[in-house]
A protein has these predicted regions:
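Conserved active-site tyrosine of GNAT-family acetyltransferases
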Residues: 47, 146, 151
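Conserved beta-strand in the GNAT
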Residues: 76, 82-91, 97-104
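Conserved catalytic-core motifs of GNAT/GCN5-like acyltransferases
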Residues: 137, 152-169
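Conserved acetyl-CoA-binding loop-helix of GNAT-fold acetyltransferases
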Residues: 105, 111-124
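Conserved GNAT acetyl-CoA-binding A-motif
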Residues: 126-139
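A conserved beta-turn-beta hairpin within the catalytic core of GNAT-like acetyltransferases
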Residues: 91-101, 110, 160-165
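Low-acidity, Ser/Thr- and Arg-rich intrinsically disordered low-complexity segments
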Residues: 2-5, 9-12
């Protein structure tokens, strides 16, 4: 395994090393904004594995203009010391609206509960940067997961990359990442 900034890349494993062993005896899910070019490339590699190779949402790459925008924050999700997840967030305008997208966790690690920490980290971080609301396009099988995290549906499902997605929204004023209670 190759260590990057104190954690481990899942893409440079030797056949004899177990990733779960590398994660540590009692791994915890943690998230952080990428700190350098190597971490950003790892973030992009995880997205490539999930959105291009596994889900086939994109033909060759899921990269777009947001990846080159200096306001975009690329986040890595760690399971113990192993980088296995991502999320990307960026401001949509000056009104405080942010977008979260490219939430991805490598298949073998989805059972470890990293999706929730990644989403909560994105919500909290956008709020810390002055955001008031975050929107996201969610694949329909994941809508209930986002609702459990306090997100609300907005409008009807619409196709994105030839697959139905539901636009969802969450308020960022509550530091817990939960939408304010109605009324």
């Amino acid at each position: 395994l190759r260590a990057i900034s104190g954690f481990v890349s899942p893409f440079s494993t030797s056949a004899s090393l177990d990733l779960e062993e590398a994660a540590g005896a009692a791994p915890a899910a943690t998230c952080r904004v990428v700190a350098d070019t190597a971490e950003r490339e790892l973030h992009l590699r995880i997205r490539l594995e999930v959105f291009v190779r596994e889900q086939r949402l994109f033909d060759t790459s899921d990269r777009d203009a947001h990846d080159d925008d200096p306001r975009t924050l690329h986040v890595l999700g760690l399971w113990g010391r192993v980088a296995v997840g991502t999320v990307r967030l960026y401001p949509l305008d000056e009104s405080g609206q942010w977008k979260g997208d490219r939430l991805a966790v490598l298949g073998p690690f989805r059972k470890h509960g990293l999706g929730g920490p990644l989403v909560r980290f994105a919500v909290r971080t956008a709020g810390e940067f002055g955001g008031s609301e975050m929107v996201a396009q969610i694949q329909l099988p994941n809508v209930a997961f986002f609702e459990r995290l306090g997100w609300r549906r907005r409008g009807e499902p619409a196709d994105y990359c030839d697959r139905p997605h539901q636009q969802m929204v969450i308020g960022l004023s509550d530091p817990t990442g939960r939408s304010p209670a109605p009324g």
